Amino acid sequence: MPERTSAHDPALLLFGSDNRYVSECQDCGGRVSNAAMMGANILKLKPVIELKDGQLICAEKIRGSDYRRLCIKLIREKLDAFPPDLQDVALVRTPGLEADICEAIEAELRQRGFQNVRWHEAGGVITAHGGPGVFGFAFSEIRRRYGRSLP
């Protein structure tokens, strides 16, 4: 019988950053070297930050210039990899995330069957470290009695 994990223990917490702002925010704060910033901008790389074992890590980098399409792609990949409990999904944004991107993200999640889709504004720490235009989401994964994911 599937059981829901606690809302305080999300299976996945992801943040993706629109690197149009990397040079303005992350470089100024010293979090990204000039070489890394230039390489990310040339290759159009956007970092995906995951919360694993209580630490924020750069799990992957996705490539492309259409941030809206990349956000939808990220959602699809993660929901396919981790079967979600379709009750709730929490979405986080920093100022600068365009309204059409927010609407596309919400439409994708509702189409996937999520019942409660809630947006939250990121606090000062996430905004200062990620910069404008950051999108994040968290959901609970459905697990079997012994902790294995459903097929």
Write out the residue ranges for each language-model feature:
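Mixed-charge interfacial surface used for oligomerization/domain docking
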Residues: 1-151
